[in-house]
C-alpha cells in the first residue's frame, strides 16, 4: 500500500531538512540548532511560488549569521532538488520555491494510489487522547442545544484518529446531582398517571411527554406498589430506572447523528466506588488540598458571612483566582470536587485530554485547567495537555423566523426531529461551517437550499458532479487514467495544488483541535472545482469529457476522480457521507 503520509508537503519538509544537513556538514550552520520553528507551507500569495520556508529567518540569529546570507546558501542547496525550478529569496530571508509541473502531477498520482488513506497522518504517534463530549444531564432526549457540541466533539475525535492518535470517545453521565432526583419525582408523577390518576406536573419538575413511557413501564412492573408510598421507598429505584431510560434515549438520539461513544462514565458510580475519596487523599498527600476558610463572596460583608472550614484545592498555584472548595459544608461533593476526581481518573489512561463544553461553562475553565495541571504534574512530571473547547448555542430558524418549541419535549426542539427533517449529513456539516465559539443560526430552509450560498450543498454538489462525469465517461467508453497527466495544464494543476493541501490541513486542524478547518478547506476545494467545471460552459475544450480527445478526457477524469477522493476523505473525517447524486 502507498504510504499516504509521504505527500508532497511532508516530502519537501524533508528536502529542506536535508538541505540544512548539507549546510551543517559544510560548516555553514552549527549542528546544535533546533529546527522546531522551521516551516514549509504555501505562500499566502500563489504568485510568489508553490512553497515557502522561513528556515533562514529562524535559524540565522542562533547561528550568528545574517538571514539573507543564510538564505542564499540554503537556496543554492534547495535548487539541487530536481523538482525545484527556482528558490527565490524574498524580504529579509524567506525562500519561495517554484516546483516543476511534474511534482504536482506526481502528487495527483499519489492521491490515486493512496485512495481513502490520502491525508492520513502519523503525527499523533499513537498517543492516547480522551475526548469527552455531549455529557448532557440524563434528564431527557437530546435537543439542539446539545447538537453542536456533539458534532464538534465527534468530528474532533475522528480527526485525531485520522492524524495518528488513539482516541477514547467519552460521555460523562451526570447522574449524582439534584437534577436526577427531580427526574425521579417527575417519573413518579407519570407512574401515577399510568395507574389512572389525573396529575398536574408541578413547577420545577420535568413536564415532557417523553417520560410517559417510563411511567407506564414502571406501572406495568410494580402495579400500584409505590403510588402512595413515601418518597424514600421509591426514589432510588425510580431514579435508577429513569436514568437508564434517558440514557437509552440519548444513545438512540446520538446514533441518528452517527455518534457512538466508547465509554460512558457514571458520576454516581465514581462516587460510590470510593475513587473520589481516593482522589482527595492523593491530593492531600501531595499538599494540593488543605482545610481552610473561604473568603467572603463579593457583595457579602463580615456581618452576614459565616466562614466555614472546608477542604480547599490549591488552584491559585496553577493560575486560578482563588482556592476552590471540593466539598460543601454538609460533606457533599461540590461540582468542582466531583469534576476534579473525574479528570484525575481520565488522566490515568490518556496522554492528553480534551473537553467539549457549552459556552455557558466558560467561568469554570480556569479552575479545571488548574486542577488538571496539578493532578498530572504533582509527582514532578510535565502537566498533561488539557484543552477545553467552548461551543456556542445554536438558534433555530425557519425562513428567518424562530422555530416554535416541541410539545413532546416540554420546552425544546429535539435533535431526532431535526435529523429526521433535514438528514444527518446536513446537520453535521452545518455545525462545522463556523468556529464553535461563534454564534450560529440553523435555518431549516437554508440548510437544504440548492444554492452556492449553502456550504453543505456546495461541497456535496461538487462531489455529485464528479460522480456524474465519471458515470457519463464510463457510459461513453472513457476511463480515468494517469497515463497522460502531462496533458494537464496550469488550470488543472491549480486544482491539484489546492487538493494537495489536504494532508497539512488535517495536521494543522488536529494540532489546533479545530475540525471546522476541514469544512472550510472542503468549501474552498469545491469552489475551485466548480470554477474550473464552469469553464466548460463556454469552452468545450475545457470540459472533463472531450469526445474528440480520449487522452485528455482520461487525464481530466483522473483529475476529477482524485478531487472527489479528497472531498470524500475530508467528509469522512467529519462523519459525513459524500453524495453520489443530487
UniProtKB/Swiss-Prot annotation:
Primary localization class, coarse: cytoplasm
Reaction equation(s) it catalyzes: tRNA(Arg) + L-arginine + ATP = L-arginyl-tRNA(Arg) + AMP + diphosphate
InterPro entries found in the cross-reference section: aa-tRNA-synth_I_CS, aa-tRNA-synth_Ia, Arg-tRNA-ligase, Arg-tRNA-synth_N, Arg-tRNA-synth_N_sf, ArgRS_core, DALR_anticod-bd, Rossmann-like_a/b/a_fold
Domain of life: Bacteria
Motif ('HIGH' region): 136-146
UniProt cross-references to PANTHER family, sorted A to Z: ARGININE--TRNA LIGASE, CYTOPLASMIC (PTHR11956:SF5), ARGINYL-TRNA SYNTHETASE (PTHR11956)
Protein name according to UniProt: Arginine--tRNA ligase
Source taxonomy: Bacteria, Pseudomonadati, Pseudomonadota, Alphaproteobacteria, Sphingomonadales
Encoding gene per record: argS
Amino acid at each position: 500500500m502507498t504510504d499516504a503520509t509521504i505527500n508532497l508537503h511532508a516530502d519537501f519538509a524533508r528536502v529542506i531538512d536535508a538541505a540544512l544537513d548539507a549546510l551543517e556538514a559544510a560548516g555553514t550552520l552549527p549542528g546544535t540548532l533546533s529546527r522546531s520553528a522551521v516551516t514549509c507551507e504555501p505562500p499566502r500569495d500563489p504568485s510568489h511560488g508553490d512553497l515557502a520556508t522561513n528556515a533562514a529567518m529562524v535559524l540565522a540569529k542562533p547561528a550568528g549569521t545574517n538571514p539573507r546570507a543564510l538564505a542564499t546558501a540554503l537556496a543554492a542547496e534547495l535548487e539541487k532538488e530536481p523538482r525545484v525550478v527556482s528558490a527565490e529569496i524574498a524580504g529579509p530571508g524567506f525562500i519561495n520555491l517554484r516546483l516543476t509541473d511534474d511534482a504536482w502531477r506526481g502528487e495527483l498520482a499519489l492521491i490515486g494510489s493512496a485512495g481513502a488513506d490520502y491525508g492520513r497522518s502519523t503525527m499523533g504517534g499513537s498517543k492516547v487522547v480522551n475526548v469527552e463530549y455531549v455529557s448532557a444531564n440524563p434528564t431527557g432526549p437530546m435537543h439542539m442545544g446539545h447538537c453542536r457540541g456533539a458534532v464538534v466533539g465527534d468530528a474532533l475525535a475522528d480527526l485525531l484518529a485520522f492524524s495518528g492518535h488513539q482516541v477514547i470517545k467519552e460521555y460523562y453521565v451526570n447522574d449524582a446531582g439534584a437534577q436526577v432526583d427531580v427526574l425521579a419525582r417527575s417519573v413518579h408523577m407519570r407512574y401515577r398517571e399510568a395507574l389512572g390518576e389525573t396529575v398536574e406536573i408541578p413547577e420545577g419538575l420535568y413536564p415532557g411527554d417523553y417520560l410517559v413511557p417510563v411511567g407506564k413501564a414502571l406501572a406495568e412492573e410494580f402495579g400500584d406498589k409505590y403510588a402512595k408510598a413515601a418518597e424514600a421507598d421509591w426514589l432510588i429505584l425510580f431514579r435508577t430506572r429513569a436514568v437508564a431510560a434517558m440514557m437509552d434515549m440519548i444513545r438512540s438520539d446520538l446514533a441518528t447523528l452517527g455518534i457512538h461513544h466508547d465509554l460512558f462514565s457514571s458520576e454516581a458510580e465514581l462516587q460510590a466506588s470510593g475513587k473520589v475519596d481516593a482522589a482527595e487523599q492523593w491530593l492531600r498527600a501531595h499538599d494540593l488540598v488543605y482545610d481552610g476558610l473561604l473568603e467572603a463572596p463579593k457583595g457579602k460583608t463580615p456581618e452576614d458571612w459565616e466562614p466555614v472550614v472546608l477542604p480547599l484545592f490549591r488552584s491559585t498555584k496553577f493560575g486560578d483566582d482563588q482556592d476552590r472548595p471540593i466539598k460543601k459544608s454538609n460533606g457533599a461533593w461540590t461540582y468542582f470536587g466531583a469534576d476534579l476526581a473525574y479528570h484525575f481518573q481520565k488522566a490515568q489512561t490518556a496522554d492528553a485530554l480534551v473537553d467539549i463544553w457549552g459556552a455557558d461553562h466558560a467561568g469554570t475553565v480556569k479552575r479545571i485547567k488548574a486542577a488538571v495541571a496539578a493532578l498530572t504534574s504533582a509527582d514532578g512530571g510535565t502537566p498533561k495537555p488539557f484543552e477545553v473547547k467552548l461551543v456556542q448555542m445554536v438558534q433555530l430558524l425557519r425562513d428567518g423566523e424562530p422555530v416554535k418549541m416541541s410539545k413532546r419535549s416540554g420546552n425544546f426542539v429535539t435533535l431526532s426531529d431535526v435529523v429526521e427533517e433535514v438528514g444527518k449529513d446536513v446537520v453535521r456539516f452545518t455545525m462545522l461551517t463556523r468556529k464553535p465559539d461563534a454564534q450560529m443560526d440553523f435555518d431549516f430552509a437554508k440548510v437544504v437550499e440548492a444554492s452556492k450560498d449553502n456550504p453543505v450543498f456546495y461541497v456535496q454538489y461538487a462531489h455529485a458532479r464528479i460522480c456524474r462525469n465519471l458515470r457519463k465517461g464510463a457510459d461513453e467508453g472513457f476511463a480515468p487514467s494517469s497515463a497522460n497527466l502531462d496533458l494537464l495544464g496550469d488550470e488543472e494543476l491549480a486544482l491539484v495544488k489546492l487538493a494537495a493541501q489536504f494532508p497539512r490541513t488535517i495536521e494543522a486542524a488536529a494540532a489546533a483541535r479545530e475540525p471546522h478547518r476541514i469544512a472550510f478547506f472542503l468549501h474552498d476545494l469545491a469552489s475551485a472545482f466548480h470554477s474550473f467545471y464552469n469553464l466548460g460552459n463556454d469552452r468545450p475544450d475545457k470540459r472533463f469529457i472531450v469526445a474528440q480527445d480520449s487522452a485528455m478526457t482520461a487525464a481530466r477524469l483522473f483529475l476529477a476522480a482524485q478531487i472527489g477522493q479528497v472531498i470524500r476523505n475530508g467528509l469522512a473525517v467529519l462523519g459525513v457521507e459524500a453524495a453520489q447524486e443530487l
